[in-house]
Design a protein with these regions (language model features):
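N-terminal Rossmann-like NAD(P)+-binding subdomain of aldehyde/semialdehyde dehydrogenases
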Residues: 1-119
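Short acidic-hydrophobic, aromatic-tinged amphipathic segments that line or gate anion-handling sites
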Residues: 1-7, 178-183, 303-308
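Flexible, glycine/charged-enriched surface loops at secondary-structure junctions
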Residues: 98-103, 225, 262-267, 287-297, ...
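Conserved small-residue-rich beta-alpha loop and adjacent elements
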Residues: 103-169
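Conserved NAD(P)+-binding/catalytic subdomain of aldehyde/semialdehyde dehydrogenases
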Residues: 175-263
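A glycine- and small/hydrophobic-rich beta-loop-beta segment
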Residues: 258, 266-341
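C-terminal core of ALDH-fold dehydrogenases
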Residues: 318-432
Length: 432
């Protein structure tokens, strides 16, 4: 890890640089895979599964028998943990339901919104070094609460042609309708355009590597919506001298083990804490099964000391971390001054792992500084809000002249006329 002390503000941009995920140089490769899936459907997806995931599949769909077999393979303890997490995620997201109300902007002019679920959504769950069954819950539970009619899940199978049992169990618990064995670019293309087996969806959610990210970017240009721009995972710990270096080191390492391009940052007002955390990170790192991944990630990570808590907060808002852990004596007052972060974890007993799994908040969050403009996944991510307006005669008489004047000044005479003909009818005593 890189140790930095009292950086000048002019250095902040350089200090806060993240590992870059450049997807533009992948676009030609990704586009060729997408185009073939569009043209050949299942056959192309099956071929790419053999090429990229090294598995020959008879079909893409996961059968009911496979789901039942998977359920039998998941331990009762893990099932209970998944159900607990699902319950908490459900409770938190159900509380986000939108309740629209009618607003009278003028007498006779009434406006309102109605929340409507996105009918078909696609969830992408990566394979790789660890089964991300928690992400199934984070995406499928709010989709079901929102009322999405079709929830489609794609995930790469293992070399044995099977999906990890915990992923299948989480999908069942969360209410996923259909599951397919497809990963990478081909999975994104299948959900974006549809194949003989995989339904076309209207919005795609979920993390992935740089190829998945590039695929989502390309299909979102014109054909389907996506959740948000994605990048490597990241955490910042904002701490003072009261923080426990053991806890801080554990939190930094929990992020570092995600992947070699993850980033973990400490911003503190205490030199003593900076030094203690460095020692503790090295001690805990040696004990981790995923030590090699975490070790590479730590090369992107920094332990930064600043002069004051005000400066620490300003630097934090400039960084806009995906995950922010605040371990200070007055963490609630510090939290009030945070304006750029994906999800915030308050106090020494609130590890980022809680949000990753079971506190109830969503772990699908903006990375790469996008927390300055994007929110994490929530119930709103799975709905659209349609606006309605109703105008009665009294209302048209009030706002009609203003509309006519504004339309005339924008040289949109047909817009003006649409109001004028109605006002004329009202003057003649005929409002129909």
């Amino acid at each position: 890890m890189i140790l930095i002390s009292n950086p000048d503000k002019s250095q902040w941009q350089e200090i806060l640089k993240r590992p870059v995920m450049n997807t533009e140089n992948l676009f030609d490769t990704v586009r060729s895979v997408i185009d073939r899936v569009k043209e050949e459907g299942d056959r192309a997806v099956l071929d790419y599964e053999e090429k990229f995931d090294k598995v020959m599949l008879a079909s893409l769909a996961v059968s009911e028998e496979e789901q039942q077999e998977a359920e039998n393979l998941v331990s009762e303890d893990l099932k209970a943990a998944i159900r607990l997490a699902k319950q908490n995620i459900e409770t938190f997201h159900a509380a986000q339901r939108f309740e629209g109300k009618k607003v009278q902007t003028q007498p006779g002019v009434t406006c309102w919104q109605k929340a409507v679920a996105i009918e078909k959504v696609g969830l992408y769950i990566p394979g790789g070094t660890a089964p991300l069954f928690s992400t199934v819950l984070m995406l499928a539970v709010p989709a079901r609460i929102a009322g999405c009619k079709e929830i489609v899940l794609c995930t790469p199978p293992g070399r044995d042609g099977k999906v990890h049992p915990a992923v299948l169990f989480a999908a069942k618990v969360a209410g996923v309708n259909r599951i397919f064995k497809a990963g990478g670019i081909q999975a994104i293309a299948a959900m974006a355009y549809g194949t003989e087996s995989v339904p076309k969806v209207y919005k795609i959610f979920g993390p992935g590597n740089q190829y998945v990210t590039a695929a989502k970017q390309l299909v979102s240009l014109r054909d389907v919506a996506i959740d948000m721009p994605a990048g490597p995972s990241e955490v910042e710990v904002l701490a003072d001298e009261t923080a426990n270096p053991i806890f801080v080191a554990a939190d930094l390492l929990s992020q570092a083990e995600h992947g070699v391009d993850s980033q973990a940052i400490l911003i503190t007002t205490s030199v003593e804490l900076q030094q203690a955390v460095k020692v503790e990170v090295e001690r805990q790192l040696a004990l981790l099964p995923r030590k090699e991944i975490a070790e590479k990630s730590l090369a992107n990570s920094k332990l930064i000391v600043v002069d004051s808590m005000a400066e620490a907060i300003e630097l934090t808002n400039a960084y806009a971390p995906e995950h922010l852990i605040i371990e200070t004596e007055d963490y609630l007052s510090v939290a009030e001054r945070i304006v750029n972060a994906g999800s915030v974890f308050l106090g020494s007993l609130t590890p980022e792992s809680a949000g990753d799994y079971a506190s109830g908040t969503n772990h699908t969050l903006p990375t790469n500084g996008y927390a300055k403009a994007y929110s994490g996944v929530s119930l709103d991510s799975f709905i659209r809000k349609i606006t309605f307006q109703e105008i009665k005669p009294e209302g048209l008489n009030i706002i009609g002249p203003a509309i006519e004047l504004m339309a005339a000044n924008e040289q949109l005479d047909a817009h003006k006329n649409a109001v004028s003909v109605r006002l004329g009818q009202l003057e003649n005593g005929n409002g129909n």
